[in-house]
Amino acid sequence: MRRRDFFKFGKKGIVPKTNWEMFLHRVQRLTFSDIKLIDTELQIACIEIKNPNLAQTLISICADHQVAFLYDKLVDIDSVSGRPILLVKVNNNSTPDFVSEGVCVADFTCLCGDLFEKGFNQFEFVPPELNLSQWFNEPSFHDSRPYYSITSGLMEIDTIFSNAMTARLGGFGLNSNIALGNALLNKSIPELFKISQTFEVTELLVSPVWPDELRFDSLFKNISDINLCRVFLGQRGSYIWGQRFYIKALPPKKISPKNIVTSEDEEQEFKINPIDLMELKEIIDPQGIFQYEDEFCEIRNRML
């Protein structure tokens, strides 16, 4: 749908009649960008935006019309099926803002190479052209050792949930009240801690390498305090949308990322029960607005 087609709505009798047409109309009205219809029968559309702050409203529109919100830098579009899709491209590389010495806040489009040049040494082994969303969602960029998700330097995330509600995820303790007013988060936190107590997670905590799974080790007070946002490191785009990242610069050689210290063929005796992860997905993203793990395009494959 082109911009000039949009202005015909309501003037020449061209009005949206179906849920899909109404969805496209709302997206067009929000972005004033050309919508590329990839497949009208399967209801797959693509939009390119310049303002990353439109993500929350786009997610809200997707939730209203039960359309998947998929970020083009994370998804293998050929593996997606079974539901209407909005493929989102963001033509913007933002720059970090420093809130104090060695601590910055950066949008998901900020390039990892820019952060590395500014002294954030945890990005040493991340390809410089990748952005924070790609880094956050790719398991192989994060520390291979249990309890060491702290070496990401990630402190907090301004998070958007599949119902378009927001929360700042970070440290979590007895007096935390971040779940108040957010139904999905309110249901998800007990489920996260429930999974953290399973046999599989208990075994992984004493293993030499954490698998390519959610970082439930971040829910244990060991070398660092409990941190909710670090649970989702390497989440493959499946559970939350990370909009803005609060990151602390780390000295060199603090991180042992999986893409450097482990091989792809290394087998894990224990992995998190997939049924537990499926139940978590149904709680935190019941409509499937975000992608599923098997729809994620591994960064190593994208760069071949």
Locate each region found by the language model.
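A charged N-terminal "starter" segment
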Residues: 1-21
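Glycine-rich N-terminal segment of FAD-binding domains in flavoprotein oxidoreductases
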Residues: 18-109, 120
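Activity-critical C-terminal alpha-helical subdomain
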Residues: 270-304
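Short glycine/threonine-rich loop-to-helix capping motif typified by GTGT followed
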Residues: 17, 221, 244, 261-276, ...
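FAD-binding subdomain of flavoenzyme oxidoreductases
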Residues: 108, 113, 120-255
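General beta-strand structural signal in soluble alpha/beta enzymes
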Residues: 2-9, 35-39, 46-49, 67-73, ...
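Structural signal for hydrophobic packing residues in well-ordered secondary-structure cores
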Residues: 24-31, 62-66, 112-120, 140, ...
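Glycine-rich, small/acidic residue-mixed loop/short-helix segments
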Residues: 233, 249-250, 256-266, 272
